[in-house]
Amino acid sequence: MKNKSALLLLALLFTVTASAVDSKLFVDNWLFTLTDSTKMSLHDYNDSSWRKLTLPHDWSIEGDFLATNPSGASGGALPGGIGWYRKHFDINDYAKNKRYYIDFDGVYMNSTVYVNGVELGTRPYGYSSFRYDITQYVKKNGNVVAVRVDNSDQPNSRWYSGCGIYRNVYLVETENIHVAHWGSFVTASQNGDMNIDISIDNKTNSKDKITVRNSIVDFHGRVVAVSSSVSLANGNAI
């Protein structure tokens, strides 16, 4: 059982040609205000008076414990409300032939995300991670991401949830052909047989031939390599 467990972990050491993923922690130099205005989503909005902070952040725990707070006892008797986060950023190694994403591990709750004034979408609730493709909206310099967080409808939880971007955020850069988000899945049977499923996403305008290489290394240094080539149409995933 011990050998099988180690083998399973080592099976994750796979590489995919032209699929490099550069995921950078994106938590420093955010700005925050516990107020609300639709203008706060605009690229050129004046946020110079906002509070500067590092994520993760929970504005609720910074408030006062009051019996009159609508969150009630289950919410810690702490305030909710609506808050905004903004971050100015550059992409120093920006390239037009790359893909760019922003990943949120968790925002509580009802978050709406904007990049350079463009609304990307709204994520209800607050416990799931989510991603937006920002490739067509970003440039090398002078980018702004804005996040509206609405936890004003109280009470909404059976326990203390907090408010805000309470988990990490990542800026992700990939090739146009890359392993899909959450695109690797490894399973093993009782007798030690292993199955590795890899999803590949093609964002190019052409049909490409790709090679997926999976390597399994045992305790004796023996390597078993399996390679397969497939054609992948543009805009598709396998």
Please give the residue ranges for each predicted region:
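Accessory carbohydrate-binding/adhesion or oligomerization-edge regions at the termini
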Residues: A20-S71, V144-R148, S152
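Short, P/G- and charge-enriched loop/turn segments at secondary-structure junctions
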Residues: S71-A77, F185
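Short, surface-exposed linear segments at secondary-structure transitions and domain or protein termini
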Residues: T35, K52, Y132, A233-I238
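Beta-strand-rich binding/interaction modules
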Residues: V115, D193-L232, A237-I238
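Bacterial N-terminal signal peptides
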Residues: L8-T15
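Short, solvent-exposed loop/linker segments at the N-terminal edge
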Residues: V186-G192
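Accessory beta-strand-rich segments of carbohydrate-active enzymes
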Residues: K24-F26, F32-D36, G80-F185, K203-T204, ...
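Bacterial N-terminal signal peptides that target proteins for export
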Residues: M1-L7
